[in-house]
A protein has these predicted regions:
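C-terminal hydrophobic helical "lid"/dimerization subdomain
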Residues: 1-3, 251-255, 298-345
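Glycine-rich beta-strand-centered segment in the early N-terminal region that forms part
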Residues: 20-35, 48-93, 112, 132-139
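NAD(P)H dinucleotide-binding glycine-rich loop of Rossmann-like/cofactor-binding domains
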Residues: 89-174
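Adenosine-nucleotide cofactor-binding segment
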Residues: 173, 188-252
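N-terminal Rossmann-fold NAD(P) dinucleotide-binding loop
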Residues: 180-181
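Glycine-rich phosphate-binding loop and adjacent beta-alpha segment
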Residues: 192, 196, 247-310, 344-345
């Protein structure tokens, strides 16, 4: 089978590898239908973070269950499923509290190679999300939106939920990648009255407005702080969705949040140090982390996509076949695509 493989920064290739098989009774083998490139993949693609040469890539997909282990009872062969990057069990205290991204029973579970023809998905019971029908029952737009439920839409929703966005709030969304844009959708779903999206790129600004943003802020740093405080009559935001992960973005978030606000942080941290003084002096809460993908998909997001209440699949602005995986990464690296869709045959 074919699978996307990392060679070195800036170089992705397709390699042949044996088709995966059931190794544990909790496994499922998935035939991938659609996958994609994540903004987090660019950290190692650009050489900013380390990754072993020859490792398989991808952590977002939808597909068809090919085979299941004897202890997998929630899905069966032939089911159409969302394949999350998380592996919740649905039974531990973390999962029951709604934080399946931190499942205590499956802490070591992590699969890669979703950008391939087949995937062995470990700890499959409960974690996989069954989609009614088959891929042929849906148009391309809906399939793309279903694909976002494996990561970016659920992660954007996690940012808004942990930031405790509620009816009438003023929300700032930091980051105009797919997660940030999905955060705009999530803030609107949760009732935000004003959504300020931080973006310097026209195509992303337009999509943010389509998704429900009311204001666009192009500035960064101190200028961004001044602009947002001016927009909020010096009050600051009720909630901030931090979807970047840099030290500057977290610092900016603490400055634009009003006293008592909550920051929902889903940007992968790129610096081990963080100044928490502003959090204390302003009574600001900092939450967020690994998204509760299965929890949010099953409780709200799958229904929202199937009933066309949201259309997060619009974040896919370029489409590629699996053999063109290098081009898919290049398009995102050069910002020619907001998010690259990968069609797997």
């Amino acid at each position: 089978m074919k699978v996307a493989t990392f060679i070195e920064p800036g170089k992705m290739v397709i390699t042949d590898t044996p088709k995966p098989v059931i190794e544990q009774e909790t496994d499922a083998v998935i035939k991938i239908v659609r996958a994609c490139v994540c903004g987090s993949d660019l950290w190692w693609y650009r050489g900013i973070s380390k990754r072993e040469s020859g490792s398989f890539a991808g952590h977002e997909a939808i597909g068809i269950v090919e085979e299941v282990g004897t202890k997998v009872t929630d899905v069966s062969k032939g089911d159409f499923v969302i394949v999350p990057f998380t592996h919740g069990c649905g039974q531990c205290p973390s999962c029951k509290a709604g934080f399946d991204g931190n499942c205590t029973n499956h802490q070591a579970a992590k699969n890669v190679g979703y950008q391939g023809q087949y995937l062995r998905y470990t700890n499959a019971n409960w974690a996989l999300v069954k989609i009614p029908g088959q891929p042929s029952d849906y148009d391309n737009e809906t399939l793309n939106s279903l694909l976002t439920l494996s990561d970016v839409m659920a992660t954007g929703y996690h940012a808004a939920a942990t930031a405790e966005v509620k009816e009438g709030d003023t929300v700032v969304v930091m980051g105009d990648g797919a997660v940030g844009l999905c955060g705009v959708i999530a803030a609107k779903m949760l009732g935000a009255n004003r959504i300020i999206a931080m973006s310097r790129h026209k195509d992303r600004q337009e999509l943010a407005l389509t998704f429900g943003a009311t204001d666009i802020v192009e500035e960064r740093g101190d200028e961004a702080v001044k602009r947002i405080l001016d927009l909020t009559n010096q009050a600051g935001a009720d909630a901030v969705l931090e979807c970047v992960g840099t030290e500057q973005s977290v610092d900016t978030a603490t400055q634009i949040a009003r006293p008592g606000a909550v920051i929902g942080r889903v940007g992968i941290p790129q610096n081990p140090d963080m100044n928490t003084n502003n959090l204390f002096w302003k009574n600001i809460g900092l939450r967020g982390g690994i998204a509760s993908v299965t929890t949010f998909d099953k409780s709200v997001l799958l229904d929202a996509v199937l009933t066309h209440k949201i259309n997060p699949g619009l974040v896919f602005t370029k489409s590629f076949v699996l053999d063109d995986i290098q081009k898919a990464y290049e398009a995102m690296d050069k910002r020619d695509a907001i998010k690259s869709l990968v069609i797997v045959d």
